[in-house]
């Protein structure tokens, strides 16, 4: 969905990403390549972890747009890894709305695929999802 912001008149591109229990609502705004997550700079929010920051910027780097758009994120739930992956999916989806030509390279890299893996539920009679009590033969 493309929305023109009333106060600045700039086009804003939206994308939502999910991973495990994390949800990220991402806005791409023409700018200088800043990452703002929940009102904090991205490197501070993700604890200066280059891996998380690389994951998030990967779709932009694939298309050569690293310093052309600011990424504004509202992330909730999960941990930092789930949030970083959900932001990546949101950025990729927003880039598809920006230009439909962006879709094939992003799809080839796997950035538009939602990771279906989630925590397996605990079963009764077991300690965890699969961990059984110690077996005693006698």
Swiss-Prot record:
HAMAP family: Ribosomal_uS9_B. Residues 119-138 have a biased composition (Basic residues). The keyword Transferase does not apply. Keywords: Ribonucleoprotein, Ribosomal protein. InterPro entries: Ribosomal_Su5_D2-typ_SF (IPR020568), Ribosomal_uS9 (IPR000754), Ribosomal_uS9_bac/plastid (IPR023035), Ribosomal_uS9_CS (IPR020574), Ribsml_uS5_D2-typ_fold_subgr (IPR014721). Belongs to the universal ribosomal protein uS9 family. GO terms for molecular function: RNA binding; structural constituent of ribosome. It comes from Nostoc sp. (strain PCC 7120 / SAG 25.82 / UTEX 2576). Residues 100-138 are annotated as: Disordered. It holds the Pfam family Ribosomal_S9. One of its GO terms (cellular component) is cytosolic small ribosomal subunit. One of its GO terms (biological process) is translation. This is Small ribosomal subunit protein uS9. Gene3D superfamilies: 3.30.230.10. Residues 100-118 have a biased composition (Basic and acidic residues). PANTHER family: RIBOSOMAL PROTEIN S9, SMALL RIBOSOMAL SUBUNIT PROTEIN US9M. SUPFAM superfamilies: Ribosomal protein S5 domain 2-like.
């Amino acid at each position: 969905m493309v929305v023109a912001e009333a106060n600045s008149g700039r086009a804003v591109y939206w994308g939502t990403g999910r991973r495990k229990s994390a949800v990220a609502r991402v806005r791409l705004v023409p700018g200088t390549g800043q990452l703002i997550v929940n009102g904090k700079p991205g490197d501070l929010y993700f604890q200066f972890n280059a891996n998380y920051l690389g994951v998030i910027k990967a779709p932009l780097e694939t298309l050569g747009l690293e310093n052309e758009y600011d990424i504004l994120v509202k992330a909730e739930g999960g941990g930092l890894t789930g949030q970083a992956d959900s932001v990546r999916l949101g950025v990729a989806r927003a880039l598809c709305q920006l230009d439909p030509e962006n879709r094939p390279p992003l799809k080839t890299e796997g950035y538009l695929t939602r990771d279906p893996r989630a925590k397996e539920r605990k079963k009764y009679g077991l300690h965890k999802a699969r961990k059984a009590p110690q077996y005693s033969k006698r």
